Structure formats: C-alpha cells, structure tokens
Amino acid sequence: GDGLDVGTAVTGLVTAFQRTPEAMMAFTFTLFTAMRSLLQQAGLPVNSVLYIVGIQGFGKSQLAKRYCTLFDDSTRRLPANSFDAGSTFASIRDALAQQRDLVVLLDDLCHSSIASEEAKRRKLLSRVIRSATNITSFGKKSGNRNVEITCAAGLVVTAEMLPSAASELTRCVLLRLDHQLADFEPS
C-alpha cells in the first residue's frame, strides 16, 4: 500500500527520540491525551497542560506541530485545533470542550513591546490554562442561558514567557528548551 509501513514509522520515531529527547516528551503527552477519556473513566487525573517554553527560534512551534498535533486542517493549511495569541478565548474554549482526546495547541505566545498587548496575551493564557485544567465544568453563553461545558482535550502551549501566577504554573508539565533543537528550523 501507499505510505510508511509500521516498522519504518516506529524506527523513525525512535531515531527522532534519540536525537531529540524533547520530542519524546511532547509525543508522550500526545499519547496521554489520546487516552484521556479512558484514564478519566478509571478515575485517574487527566487535567494538565504541556507548556513548551524557550526563546525565539529554538523550535517550540515545530516541536509541538510535529509531535503533538497529529491532524491538519486542510482549509486553514495549519495543524487542526491550532490557535495563536490573536485567537479568542471562546474559540479555544470551544475546541477544548469539543476535541475529545485530541491536542489543542495555543502557539507562539511571545512578549510584546506594547504593554497592553502583552497583558491581553497573559490574560488569554491564564484563562485557557484554567479552563484546560479545572475538573469542574466552565460556562458558555448559548442564547440567553449559560451552558456548562467541560474540557475534553489536552492543551499544549508554546511560549517565550512563563505563566504569571504560580497556581497556573503548577498546572503545567513544563518543557523548557534551553537550546535550539536539532533538525528544527525557526518558523
């Protein structure tokens, strides 16, 4: 048939993990997210965020896109469920509720020279982390009434900055890149 055979794919993945251990951590989070519903049914905690942080050009976005987002959105020509700092909280929240056992990516939260813009990004980050990690449901307006929805997806964030509040940071699995990843071009 067409495409890669399983042996070639597994060998390629193991080789990538040997070259780039960060890739193994990212892919492991993706597998954890894929089993989220099963783990939740078993009563195990499933609410966490993979938070990939590092300076510009180290390969954060490519790492997340290559090892965490397994599907593409052919209309947008981006990984499926991929959002950036300009996205609305409502759109990200809806994806977190609807994309069961899939990764939702909040990509490229970077510093801004405009203080109000950076404050807006930090507020978005805070709200998204809390929505992705609260076990309880969160509200959404539907017409004149509030509808309670719960997070069903895993959240991956790529950023140049850490969350502001310690309570947000403790909800994250932190993957700090302190060097440029091999075979990763800056995006």
What spans do the regions from the language model cover?
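Conserved AAA+/SF3 P-loop NTPase catalytic/coupling segment centered on the Walker-B
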Residues: 102-129, 160-170
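Conserved catalytic/switch belt of AAA+ P-loop NTPases
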Residues: 119-146
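Ser/Thr/Asn(+Pro)-rich, low-complexity disordered segments
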Residues: 28, 47, 81-92, 139, ...
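AAA+/P-loop NTPase substrate/partner-engagement loops
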Residues: 53, 58, 62-118
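Structural recognition of the conserved hydrophobic beta-strand(s) that form the central parallel beta-sheet
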Residues: 105-107, 131, 138, 149-160, ...
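Conserved catalytic network of the ASCE P-loop NTPase/AAA+ motor domain
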Residues: 94-99, 121-122, 146-151, 164-168
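P-loop NTPase catalytic core of nucleic-acid-dependent motor ATPases
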Residues: 1-82
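Phosphate-sensing "switch" segment of ASCE/P-loop ATPases
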Residues: 149-151, 167-187
